[in-house]
Amino acid sequence: MKIMDCTLRDGANVLGNGFPRELTEMMLRGLVNNGVSIIEYGNAKGIGAYEVSGAVAPLTDDEYLELASPLIGKAEIGMFYTAKRFLPDSAKKAADHGLSFLRVGADAGDYKISERVIRSVKDSGIKSFYSLMKAYLLTPKELAKEAEILENMGVDEITIMDSAGFMQPEQAREYVVAMKEKVHIPVGFHGHNNLGLAL
């Protein structure tokens, strides 16, 4: 099992759309120095979010990308990439700065809008992770079928995202088991502790 720490991205939703420079640098160093192997950071709404939808963060995408440069190669470092906020140069920009991955995100059932985004990420030479946001919009079997389609599009790893944070452990298990039976790529689970069930 691997753990992705996305505090510096998803956690930034609490503050607005991102953490300031000093805190981002400090947390990135701390995560890397403590052996966290996969880290997602940057604008909470994803790379390109400011240009596409005005999601203002303390730093621009370029500034977030540059501040991580001393840590490139010491962990898998990447950013979120909402499919609805596609910009043709986002993936190349991420790759040019040494990021390991972009995690494409779209609501469950919306895989068709993600194809060009996934292709752009893959063409840039970095990994395309994928988050099935609001996974509960589909049944476990329906979501697993969508994951199979996404795997065929070239996705390297896929995440079941419980965006509302209401899934109980058995429900989460059903989604994971159904998906593992359909795909050959790693399957992840992204939850929120709204029910107080986290360990």
Model-found features: residue ranges?
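Hydrophobic faces of well-ordered beta-strands that scaffold small-molecule active sites
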Residues: 3-10, 39-41, 75-82, 100-104, ...
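A structural motif
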Residues: 33-36, 99, 155, 184
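Conserved anion-binding
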Residues: 110-164
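Catalytic alpha/beta core domains of metabolic enzymes, predominantly
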Residues: 157, 161-199
